[in-house]
Amino acid sequence: KTNKIVITNDKGRLSKEEIERMLAEAEKYKAEDEAEAARISAKNALESYAYSLRNTLSDSKVDEKLDAGDKQKLTAEIDKTVQWLDDNQTATKDEYESQQKELEGVANPIMMKFYGAGGEGGMPGGMPGGGMPGGAPGGAAGDDGPTVEEVD
């Protein structure tokens, strides 16, 4: 007695069309994921910049040297930006970048005045403002990385 068994590889496999469709979907989602990552990065940059400015303003050395009107103007702009962030969690990357440029437009001239008035000194090499435009105003000039303060 003989039994004939035929084994085929087609059972339970995806067809060529299904594989192509899945690859196309993966590509589509890849672009969406990259766009979402860029949006989140822009949001984090704005948030970080606003809170960095707020911390810089709360420093007593900065507080002593800043003009009261400038400090009030900058504090109001920071508060406005933080409120905007809270109200616009799903904003686009461009909206976050636009808000950051707006905040920098107010903050940079004020911080330039502060550093120019002999605040904590600029970067070596005569770069007023202690850094590159668009960079966060560091508490300690010449520092390469972010300043981390541990609070109990």
Curated annotation (Swiss-Prot):
<keyword id="KW-0547">Nucleotide-binding</keyword>
<feature type="compositionally biased region" description="Gly residues">
    <location>
        <begin position="121"/>
        <end position="142"/>
    </location>
</feature>
<dbReference type="InterPro" id="IPR029047">
    <property type="entry name" value="HSP70_peptide-bd_sf"/>
</dbReference>
<dbReference type="InterPro" id="IPR029048">
    <property type="entry name" value="HSP70_C_sf"/>
</dbReference>
<feature type="region of interest" description="Disordered">
    <location>
        <begin position="121"/>
        <end position="152"/>
    </location>
</feature>
<dbReference type="InterPro" id="IPR013126">
    <property type="entry name" value="Hsp_70_fam"/>
</dbReference>
<protein>
    <recommendedName>
        <fullName>Heat shock 70 kDa protein</fullName>
    </recommendedName>
</protein>
<comment type="similarity">
    <text>Belongs to the heat shock protein 70 family.</text>
</comment>
<dbReference type="GO" id="GO:0030968">
    <property type="term" value="P:endoplasmic reticulum unfolded protein response"/>
</dbReference>
<keyword id="KW-0143">Chaperone</keyword>
<keyword id="KW-0020">Allergen</keyword>
<keyword id="KW-0067">ATP-binding</keyword>
<keyword id="KW-0346">Stress response</keyword>
<dbReference type="GO" id="GO:0005524">
    <property type="term" value="F:ATP binding"/>
</dbReference>
<dbReference type="GO" id="GO:0140662">
    <property type="term" value="F:ATP-dependent protein folding chaperone"/>
</dbReference>
<dbReference type="Pfam" id="PF00012">
    <property type="entry name" value="HSP70"/>
</dbReference>
<dbReference type="GO" id="GO:0034663">
    <property type="term" value="C:endoplasmic reticulum chaperone complex"/>
</dbReference>
